[in-house]
Amino acid sequence: MEPQDRTKRPQEEDNGVPIDGHNGSNSEPAAKKIKLDSPSSADSRAKGVAPIKAEYLLFPPGQKAKPTQSEAEADDNDDDAAEGRTAPTPQETQQAPQKDGKRKSQRGQNKEREFGTFSDAQRLCNTIAWTPEFSPRPCKHGDRCNALHDLRKYLKEGRRPDITTFGGKCPVWEKYGKCPSGWRCLFVHSHMDEIKHEDGRSELVLVGDASKAPEGGEEAAGEIKPGVVNMVPVGIKYDLSKKRIPLEKSEQYLAWLAKDTKHLAKHYQKHKDDETNPNDYRAQYVEPPFKPSEKRRLYFGRETPVLAPLTTQGNLPFRRLCVELGAQVTYSEMALGLPLLQGLKADWTLMRAHESEIVPPRFNPGGPIVQGYDNSKDVKFGAQIAANAPWVAVKATEALSQLLPHLRLVDLNCGCPVDAVFKSGSGSALLDSHSKLERMIRGMNAVSGEVPITAKIRMGSRDGKLTAQKLVERLALGSEDLRDMIGAPGCAAVTLHGRTRLQRYTKAADWGYIAECAALIKQFNEKSNDLADTIREADENTLPNGGKMYFLGNGDCYSHVEYFDHVDNAKVDSVMIGRGALVKPWVFEEIEKGQYLDKSSSERLTYIEKFVRYGMEAWGSDELGLNYTRRFLLEFLSFFCRYVPIGLLERLPPNLNERPPAYRGRDDLETLFASKNYKDWIKISEMFLGPAPPGFKFQPKHKSNSYEIEAEG
C-alpha cells in the first residue's frame, strides 16, 4: 500500500529551499526550487524510475532512461543482505544452473565474501608496541619470538610509510591526546619524538599519553578505544567460553520450562483424540520459580525516530553519525545468541556502543503522560540477538543484562530473511513457531533484570500466509493457557516490517497491513488491562510499560513526510528506518526539522569524512584499523550512491524504491557520488585513507561490483 497523499500536509521552507515551490521570491536558482505537483502528476511518473529533471539527464528521455536490470537486481540483493550475511536471489531459487558459468559467476550475491589480508609486512612485538624504544617490556617468548623488536627497522621496513591525509596528523591523537594504536599508527610521526640522552644516544618515544602502554598488550589496547562503552574484558569472554560465568536465573527458569513443556505435551497427547479440557492442565500447573523483575519503562513517540539494526552497515561509526544527525534509538547489529554464550570476540564486539548512544533519547514532556517513565535513566542503545531455541535466547539475555552496563533493551530478531539464519530455526523461522517464540520472550523477560524485552517481526514467512496479527496477540497477551495464570509474556514493544520473508524489495512495504496491526495492538493493550482488572490484580512484572506494548512500523521510510504520515495515519508509535538511513543519513535531521534538506556535495563529503574519523576511533589508526574503516566505508557508499539530490527531482516526495536513469550532478563531486562503479567508491575512500594496500580486496554483497587491488609488478 502506497503512503497516502502527502501534498496536503503543511510544508515549511528549508534553508531557502522551498518544498512547496513558493517562497515569495524568484531569486533562488532553478535547482533550488523544489516543487510538489498535484497527485495526478505524481501518479504519471514512470513506475520505479526517479523523475530526474531533463537538464540533468545524460540521455534524452526514452533513450536508456531506465536503470538496467542488473543495477536494480544489485540494489535489491544488497537490501536483502543488509538484514543478514547472505540472501538468495530469485534466479538462485527458481532457475536451473546456467551453462554459461562465467555469466553465472557474475550474478547474485557474494555468499562467501573475502576482503583480503591487510597487515604489516613485519609484525611488531606487543612488548614494544606502546613503549619508548629503550624500555620494552619483557617478552615471554624470548629468542623464540618471531616478531620484530627493532623499532627503527619496523618503522623503515615493517610497515607502509605514514599516509598524508588529514595533514599527516593522527585524527585520534588530535582529538583525545592519545592513540591506542601506538607505534603501529599510520600517522605515528605526528605523535612521536626523538630525544637525545646525555650519553649521546637518540631514543624514539611516543608523545604525551600516547606513550602509556595498555596493560595486557594488544588485546587490552583493543579494549580501550576512546569514547566506546560496553567493552567486555577478554577474561570475562574467556570465562564465558568455559562456562564459568554463573547464569543462575537462566538455569532455574529453563529447568522449570523443560518440565512444563513436557507436562503440556503429555497433556495434549493424552487428549489428542477428544476435546482437551484446559482446566486439567491448569490444575497441575506449577508457576515459574521466580517472577520477572519490574522493568525500566520504555518510551517511543513521534519525536523518537529509530535507526534499524542493520547487518554490516549498522556498525558503530555509522550509528554514531546517525545519532549526530538526529536518530533517537539505535540497535546493535544482529548478534547470534550461541556465539555470545561461547564468548566469541566478533559477536561481543557488536555490543559496543559510542558514548553518544548512552544519553537519553528526545522526550517531549508536554506530550502524552507516560506513567513511570524516567527519561533521565533511559539510553538510546539496544542490543538485538537471534536465537533458535529458548535456552539460547534466555542465557544470552541474562549474559547481556549482566555484562553490559548501558542497555536500553534486548530485541529478539524474528524477521531475518536470510537462508542460513532461517534454516537454523532463528530469525523469520520463528514467525511460524508462535509457541516457541512466546516461551523465548517469557524466559528472556524473566532473566533480564530491569532491561525490557522487545521483538522485531515480519508480516509472515511467505506470501499468502500472513501471521503477524496472530503473533502480535500472542506477544501482547500470551497463549490462552497461560495468560490468566502467569500474565502476559512481557514484550515491551514490537516492530513490524511490512514485508514477508520471501517478499523482496521490488515491492513496497505494506503500510495498510501495518495499520491494521496497530489497531489490533491498541485493542490488545486495552484487553490486557481488562484481564488484569477482572481476573486478578495487575502484576507489574508481567505488564511492560504499565500495560502498554509499543508498536513500531518499518519499511521504505525515506522522508519526514512519510514518517509523519505513518505516525498519524497508520497510528504507529514510531517508525524504524533502515535503508532510508543508509541512503540518506540526514533523514533523521529532516524529521526533527520537519522539512526537506537539499544537502550539497560538500556537505555529503563532510559526512564521509566523519565516518572515516569515527571508524579510526572505533577500529584504530593502524593498518588493520584503517582498512576495516575502508571496508565499511565502501559498504556504506554502496547505499550512499543511490541518493538522488532533491534539487534534481521534478516532483516530491522522493521514493526509496525508485531508481534514477543516468544523470549528472550539479557539480563534479555530486556526479561522483552518484556512481555505482566500485572504482569510484575506492577513489572516494582514498581521499581520506590514502591508497589501498596491496592485499586489500572489496567484494560488495552483489557480484557485479567486486574489487581486488593488484600489487604493482
UniProtKB/Swiss-Prot annotation:
Where do the ZnF regions (C3H1-type) fall?
A: 125-149, 170-191
Gene3D superfamilies reported in the protein's UniProt record: Aldolase class I, Zinc finger, CCCH-type
> Where do transmembrane segments lie in this chain?
none
List where Low complexity composition bias occurs: 86-98
Q: Which PROSITE patterns match?
A: UPF0034
Major location (coarse)? cytoplasm
Q: Where is this region: Disordered?
A: 1-117
What keywords does the record list, in alphabetical order? Cytoplasm, Flavoprotein, FMN, Metal-binding, mRNA processing, NAD, NADP, Nucleus, Oxidoreductase, Repeat, tRNA processing, Zinc, Zinc-finger
What biological function has been recorded for the protein in this entry?
Catalyzes the synthesis of dihydrouridine, a modified base found in the D-loop of most tRNAs. Specifically modifies U47 in cytoplasmic tRNAs. Catalyzes the synthesis of dihydrouridine in some mRNAs, thereby affecting their translation.
Protein name according to UniProt? tRNA-dihydrouridine(47) synthase [NAD(P)(+)]
